[in-house]
Amino acid sequence: MRHAHKKAKTKGSGGYFKTGEARGHHLQDGLARGYRFGFTAGSESHDGRPSRPIVHGPYVIAETDFLAPPGVTGVWAERFTRDGIFDALRARRCYGTTGARMIVRFSLGETPMGGEVTASALSGPAEFSARIIGTAPISACELVKNNREIDRAGGGATELNATLRDREAAKPGDYYYLRVTQADGEMAWASPIFVT
């Protein structure tokens, strides 16, 4: 066992970290390629503990500087049951944060985050609703279209209700998501709304 730990420390456990940092392996790259997925956040630190799991117990963790506290996934479930939560995840009615327990709502009319709307159903420029309850003042709430910021709101309060607009007509293949930044640096991302 000791030999395996030493090998992992000196050789690493594979190319996972480097591969994940390579160009083309990011969430935005997948969206640009047409993949449709919801945003979640979390970690896998092998100890099965939620929240901030780095605890020095009977096992020695020689290097912890590459470990970060896990994120938090929020879901908008119709039922507070196991099936209801998984239904919300499958429907992409979810968001991820860097760890702050924010509440994030994002919609385009009646279409919630993760949903799909046809371009023909939109009459003119799209108006999105954002409702955020932060754990610190909200410094920015950004509407991102096809990986580019197109509108922004903020104001410094811990709660924000905002209407964000796309000044151009949406077309099939477009996608929009919400990116929230608090004054303390914590962030959240709401799953995209996809235009078909």
Model-derived regions: residue spans:
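C-terminal functional module detector
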Residues: 1-19, 23-196
